């Protein structure tokens, strides 16, 4: 998600159909270039959420893990709203 997309979403602006089509095409290209099948991407998402949830309380429903392509480079992007930090004890357990 670009900064412009974030601001548009924050302000409740609708995206144009051309913009939506472009985002979908970029997603298809990112999946194709990364050679990750949807099942593997879903497994990665679950595991990433599990690891992050050990340290902070996250909003899983609002979170997003996706592939994004920009300038011929594909990145795995995790956008995870954090509710609060989880206190860790000195021995590694939660308090």
Swiss-Prot record:
Pfam families: MinE
InterPro entries cross-referenced by the UniProt entry: MinE, MinE_sf
Source species of the chain: Synechococcus sp. (strain CC9902)
Keyword annotations from UniProtKB, A to Z: Cell cycle, Cell division
Reported function: Prevents the cell division inhibition by proteins MinC and MinD at internal division sites while permitting inhibition at polar sites. This ensures cell division at the proper site by restricting the formation of a division septum at the midpoint of the long axis of the cell.
Encoding gene per record: minE
Protein name: Cell division topological specificity factor
Gene3D superfamilies assigned to the protein according to its UniProt record, in alphabetical order: Cell division topological specificity factor MinE
GO biological process, one term: regulation of division septum assembly
Family label: Belongs to the MinE family.
